Amino acid sequence: MSEIGVAVLGVGLMGADHVARIASRISGARVAVVNDQVTEKAERLAATITGCRAIADPLDAIADRDVDAVVLATPGPTHEKQLLACLEHRKPVLCEKPLTTDVETSLEVVRREAELGVRLIQVGFMRRFDDEYRALKALIDGGELGNPLVLHCVHRNPVVPGHFDSAMTVRDSLVHEVDVTRFLFDEEIVSIQIVKPTPNSLAREGLFDPQIAILRTASGRHVDVELFVTTGVAYEVRTELVAEKGSVIIGLDVGLVRKSAPGTWGGTITPSFKERFGQAYDTEIQRWVDAVRSGGTTGIYTDGPTAWDGYAATAVCEAGVQALQSGQPVAVSMVDRVSIPGA
């Protein structure tokens, strides 16, 4: 396949960014169709792109003959129906998180894809494509740091929308650290606890902020995550790995820094996720497009996190919301992957 036609469903902040990315920086793809629940927004955007059309119904957009692949940047509650439509039409899809909003529907999506015998769903956990996270993963896999022991994470936002509640801190923010943990350690998370320290007096009433998440992996590794979404400062995402033979920090806006390495650093903090992970998004979409284009030959239409990864993240976050409410550690409940051939 030479150039693929992509439908972008949902053209809010994330979707519009993907439209601009595909239209200007990604090779081998064009934006063929856009869709949004605000029809006028999609129509205005389509008018700025040669050969692009706005289609009001998302299922019609998926089925359209000019569409070879789909990017889902729609609200989470719509994902199940749209993902199943993509599977029905056998169209590769890159779905922004979450896969779906609950464990049962996420598992159903995993099963439906597995029944087809072809991998069509990729989930948009973009940190796996970030140069710093990839360098950290390579260090772990290379073994020079010895056995990884502990992961310390920081996830801060300057501000969040008015509808953002305490559970969304788990589902929308922590979900990235959940996937990072599984990506770096190649194992599942088996329990989660949410600790609520002294609250930020500047956060609106009813929003517990900050929160501290404590994760435990199947092999017993400890992961702690500071989640602080009303700092009023900037967008900050940092990760420190502590291993048997040293430690590594990423997210200092200067690239990977090893504790023993000489040098100094300084500069500004990235204002939002678009700047911090711009390279990761570009790499993610380009690799996905390349996989879709070669899928007819290879039989593989994805190059990144799978539907199973989306299901696992949903399962951990669902347990996390329970832990937020109870204040106690909660076991993560998942089916055994081997019980679903092809998952």
UniProtKB/Swiss-Prot annotation:
Tell me the protein family, please: Belongs to the Gfo/Idh/MocA family.
Classification via InterPro entries: Gfo-Idh-MocA_inositol_DH, Gfo/Idh/MocA-like_OxRdtase_C, Gfo/Idh/MocA-like_OxRdtase_N, MI/DCI_dehydrogenase, NAD(P)-bd_dom_sf
Taxonomic source organism: Mycolicibacterium vanbaalenii (strain DSM 7251 / JCM 13017 / BCRC 16820 / KCTC 9966 / NRRL B-24157 / PYR-1)
What is the top-level taxon of the source organism?
Bacteria
Tell me what reaction this enzyme catalyses: myo-inositol + NAD(+) = scyllo-inosose + NADH + H(+)
Give the protein's biological function: Involved in the oxidation of myo-inositol (MI) to 2-keto-myo-inositol (2KMI or 2-inosose).
Question: What Enzyme Commission number does this protein have?
Answer: 1.1.1.18
Pfam families in the record: GFO_IDH_MocA, GFO_IDH_MocA_C
Biological process per Gene Ontology, one example term: inositol catabolic process
Q: What keyword terms does UniProt attach to this protein?
A: NAD, Oxidoreductase
Upper classification of the source organism reads:
Bacteria, Bacillati, Actinomycetota, Actinomycetes, Mycobacteriales
List, alphabetically, the Gene3D superfamilies matched.
Answer: Dihydrodipicolinate Reductase, domain 2, NAD(P)-binding Rossmann-like Domain
- Name-wise, this protein is Inositol 2-dehydrogenase 1
Quaternary state and interactors: Homotetramer.
